[in-house]
């Protein structure tokens, strides 16, 4: 695409190369380590499900057992597979025996890696086939209904705490015109080191992410999608201490979109950086394999940092998220890189700065389904001004080709949206998307004008920052508080005790198979 902003492509290339080197350097650490969340994910992918007599999820029971025996460094797949060879049990039976205190995985007679892999192979393939079937179901539905929607996807949230009430609100929103339904997680779930089991009706500020809740909402949206003749995407959150587990649950239940950003968890949830960067890699490999779009959390930086002064940190983070995604085999078309309309309305020419930032993101990441967040920080409760702010936000999306459009609510900062609030917000967006549909193709920006100058300044600062990050490494960068003005220590935060260095002979057959398929797909099947 031709650049309206006349961006310096040498700086874009320099920034992208620096981000790639940061990701490569970090990947060396990632490849040498596993975590309790990664191993619980492997357990789930092996088909281990359910809870013990104390309602502890069986994946936690098995992994905690191996942690107690100081044996996690071999990987749960090795120990479960070894027990399968020796005892003739399937993974679920092995897990139940561990839960009942009947089996110590570390005392089972050891078998060769080849024997273990052979026992695991049909189980691994069955899980991968289930994930592929969900991906095909989505693709077949889209093909049967005229393909994907052109223009922005209208993204709406539900957050009642009760999955059954969420379904009522989600189906109503879909009928009103929503393209993506995001079920907000209950407050604090990102800090739980386990995933609750079953359907849930009590949450705070959101609803628990559980596999059963995923299934129920997917079923409801499929039904309304058939009625409406269009596919309704389902979004949830695989971030926090159970990042890859929730990615696997989403892959099993046919989710389409996942919030997934280690930096967000580090900065805003104080999750240990070593832990969550390892978890993120596996979660992104799963998302790629399942055809799930990830959304990243750069928009959150602007809730604590100034959107004018710190815009370059958003762009730098987008470059880093792109690089980390590619290392996990996640292609550009599944990278919903985030940013937000968060400049103070009192800033003169603030709209031009917003438009420049959004256009710059679109030009630098042309294939990415960019995730664009509405104004929240400067929504005051004045619903009339708020509706105007949202209209300006809608205009930027339309003019610059943003894709995942998180619909702003005029009642932001007052209460959780009513059905009527959503209706008015959808009507606002649809009017602007319709009446300005091709305006972006009709206009150019003034050479040397405010927007071109602004974009050039932000790109230059982001390129310089990425050069600095390359010298420091990602860990020290975060320790210094470069992102969002928030400092986090390398050995602090939640979850560090769940990080383990891999031992010789470690196996994770799912990561191996998914990465092989992901990289092959990214390279055009070669």
Predicted regions and their residues:
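Helix-rich catalytic cores of soluble enzyme domains
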Residues: 123-135, 145-150, 154-403, 410-418, ...
């Amino acid at each position: 695409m031709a650049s309206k902003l006349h961006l310096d492509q040498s700086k874009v290339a320099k920034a992208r190369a620096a981000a790639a080197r940061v990701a490569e350097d970090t990947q060396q650490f990632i490849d040498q380590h596993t975590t309790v969340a990664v191993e619980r994910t492997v357990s789930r992918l092996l088909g281990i499900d359910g809870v013990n007599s104390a309602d502890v999820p069986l994946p936690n029971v098995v992994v905690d057992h191996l942690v107690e025996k100081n044996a996690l460094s071999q990987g749960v797949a090795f120990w479960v597979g070894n027990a399968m060879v020796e005892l003739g049990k399937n993974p679920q039976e092995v897990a139940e025996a561990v839960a009942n205190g009947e089996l110590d995985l570390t005392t089972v007679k050891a078998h060769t890696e080849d024997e273990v892999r052979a026992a695991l192979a049909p189980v691994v393939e069955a899980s991968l086939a289930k994930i592929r079937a969900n991906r095909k179901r989505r693709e077949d539905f889209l093909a049967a209904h005229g393909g994907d929607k052109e223009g922005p996807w209208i993204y709406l949230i539900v957050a009642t705490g009760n999955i059954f009430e969420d379904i009522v609100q989600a189906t109503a929103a879909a009928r009103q015109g929503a393209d993506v339904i995001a079920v907000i997680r209950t407050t604090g779930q990102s800090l739980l080191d386990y995933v609750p089991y079953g359907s849930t009706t009590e949450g705070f500020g959101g609803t628990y992410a559980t596999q059963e809740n995923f299934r129920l909402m997917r079923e409801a949206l499929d039904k309304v999608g058939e009625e409406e003749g269009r596919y309704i995407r389902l979004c949830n959150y695989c971030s926090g201490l159970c990042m890859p587990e929730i990615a696997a649950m989403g892959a099993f239940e046919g989710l389409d979109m996942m919030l997934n950003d280690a930096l967000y968890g580090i900065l805003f949830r104080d999750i240990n950086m070593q832990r969550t960067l390892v978890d993120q890699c596996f979660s992104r490999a799963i998302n790629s394999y399942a055809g799930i779009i990830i959304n990243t959390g750069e928009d959150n930086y602007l809730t604590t940092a100034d959107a004018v002064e710190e815009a370059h940190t958003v762009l730098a983070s987008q470059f880093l998220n792109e690089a980390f995604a590619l290392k996990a085999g996640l292609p550009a078309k599944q990278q919903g890189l985030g940013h937000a309309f968060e400049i103070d309305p009192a800033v003169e020419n603030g709209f031009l700065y917003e438009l420049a930032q959004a256009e710059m993101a679109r030009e630098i990441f042309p294939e990415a389904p960019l995730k664009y967040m509405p104004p929240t920080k400067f929504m005051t409760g004045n619903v009339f001004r708020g509706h105007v702010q949202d209209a300006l936000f809608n205009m930027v999306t339309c003019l610059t080709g943003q894709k995942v459009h998180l619909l702003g609510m005029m009642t932001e900062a007052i209460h959780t949206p009513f059905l009527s609030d959503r209706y008015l917000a959808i009507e606002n967006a649809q009017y602007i998307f319709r009446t300005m549909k091709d305006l972006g193709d009709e206009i150019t920006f003034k050479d040397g004008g405010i927007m071109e100058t602004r974009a050039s300044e932000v790109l230059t600062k982001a390129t310089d920052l990425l050069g600095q990050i390359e010298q420091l490494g990602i860990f020290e960068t975060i320790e210094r508080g470069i992102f969002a003005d928030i400092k986090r220590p390398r050995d602090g935060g939640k979850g560090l005790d769940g990080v383990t260095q891999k031992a010789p002979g470690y196996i994770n057959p799912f990561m191996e198979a998914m990465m092989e398929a992901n990289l092959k797909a990214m390279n055009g099947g070669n």
